[in-house]
Curated annotation (Swiss-Prot):
Known EC number: 7.4.2.1
UniProt-listed InterPro entries: AAA+_ATPase, ABC_ATPase_HisP-typ, ABC_transporter-like_ATP-bd, ABC_transporter-like_CS, MetN_ABC_transporter-like, P-loop_NTPase
PANTHER family on file: AMINO ACID IMPORT ATP-BINDING PROTEIN, GLUTAMATE_ASPARTATE IMPORT ATP-BINDING PROTEIN GLTL
Any single GO CC term annotated in Swiss-Prot or TrEMBL for this entry: plasma membrane
Protein name: Glutamate transport ATP-binding protein GluA
SUPFAM superfamilies found in the cross-reference section: P-loop containing nucleoside triphosphate hydrolases (SSF52540)
Keyword entries, A-Z: Amino-acid transport, ATP-binding, Cell membrane, Membrane, Nucleotide-binding, Translocase, Transport
Lineage, highest ranks first: Bacteria, Bacillati, Actinomycetota, Actinomycetes, Mycobacteriales
Amino acid sequence: MIKMTGVQKYFGDFHALTDIDLEIPRGQVVVVLGPSGSGKSTLCRTINRLETIEEGTIEIDGKVLPEEGKGLANLRADVGMVFQSFNLFPHLTIKDNVTLAPIKVRKMKKSEAEKLAMSLLERVGIANQADKYPAQLSGGQQQRVAIARALAMNPKIMLFDEPTSALDPEMVNEVLDVMASLAKEGMTMVCVTHEMGFARKAADRVLFMADGLIVEDTEPDSFFTNPKSDRAKDFLGKILAH
C-alpha cells in the first residue's frame, strides 16, 4: 500500500531522512517512535508529499507519487492526515468542516455529505456537537472532528503526526480510543506518537528512528521487551522510567 525506495530528504545541509526503504501492506498499523529530531514527522509528511524529497520514490497503492499537479492532488485525496494542531475552519460548524472536502473534491451531493458527516461524527462519539463551532469544543473533541474530516474522504491510508501531543492529558485517551478502533477495522495507518501504550496495544509494527534512519523495524512486543540497538534501549530507558 505504501512503498518508499531510497528516499533521501535534506533541510539545507541537514540530512533529515537517509536511505529510507519501507513497505507497508494494506491494513497494517505502523507506529513510528523516536527521539525529537529523529525524522519521524518528516517521514510521515513525505508519504503525501507535504515534504518533498531529494532522491528516491514513494508509491501509494502501486502508483508513484507525482511531484505536483492534478495527479498529486488525486493521490493525496486517498491519504487522510491528522496533525498536532486540529486545523479546523473556525467559521464553519463541526458538520460543515466534515462535509466541505467531500462536496468540493469528491463532488458529493450536500444531502449525501451531511448524512456521511453525521455517521462519522457518531463513529468518533461527537454527533451531538455537529452544529457547534470549533471554539465551543474541547481539544480532544476538536481532534476527533479532525479524524472524522479525514475519514470523510474515504481514504486508503491514514497518517497521524503526533495527534495527541497538543492535548491535555485527560483528553488523550478519547483520541487514542478512536485511533485504536480504526486500527481494529483494518485501516492502513502510520502513526507518529509518544504514546507507548497505544504503540503496544494497537500497532502491528514499530519503526524506531534516530538521526534520519530507521534503526529498528519490528513487532511491538519485541521492541518493548528486547530492543536490539543501543539507541532504542536508551530511548525506552528514558521514556519508561517515568
